[in-house]
Amino acid sequence: MHTVSLTHQLVAIQDDFDLDKIIESGQCFRPQKLSDGRYRFLSGDALLYLTPLGDGQYDAAWYGSDRDYWADYFDLGRNYAALRCSLAGQSSYLDKSLDFGQGIRILHQDPWEMLITFLISQRKSIPAIRTAVEHLARCCGEPLSAEGDEVFLFPTPQQLCGLSEAQLMGCGLGYRTRYIQNAAAQASSGTLDLGALAALPDDALFSRLLELDGVGKKVANCVCLFGYGRTAMAPIDVWIQRLIDEEFGGRDPFPSYDQQAGIVQQYLFYYKRSTSRSVAHKK
């Protein structure tokens, strides 16, 4: 296991920024709140620990990256408080979602990790996705030790290609194993260049992702939004479809939000899933 040194820096974030809500918002599956109060984030070969100090102050400690990398990751160039204000008053349900989800931000994550993660996510609950992704990382990801904490980086395409079908199945991937194998083989050979796809416009990016084995509209939209920062893309899963039927009379509301559609979707998703689970727990 490779022991790494962290760079510490005091950072101030005055905009909407709630780490618990971000972690539970369904867009990321490896970030975690640790028992010592730190929040750990992994992205590609980069590692970050955030310790809240109060009044928007955080002790940030990172490896394999810099401050600008994480500012982009957390979309700190966008004013979410102002965005919520601009969206308010359009529907009572959206207003409740905006208030409830204050602190959520769209994370700009690693496209490779997003592709594999959301391939795994199909027909799985969020806890099950987290478990499968963590098993995959522990199976072949690079192990690191940082200030007493041991982590595993997300596997590269080459590392995944080195796993047998039985090893992948052992990570709880089930029928998704074939999808993971095909994506890893294409990315490893260069047939699939996820970095180059960043230059494509939204429609072309979406279409290219749909060509991959196992990628449907929901997975493609998730990769576009959370891997490439395409905020006009709004993934529609079971929760969102239920919300569209119950709150919007079956009419898809997202096209009217244009470049903010994906952000609106995230507020609605978080509110719908959180409140539905809360009601279920009370029964």
Predicted regions, residues:
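HhH-family (HhH-GPD) DNA N-glycosylase catalytic core used in base-excision repair
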Residues: 1-283
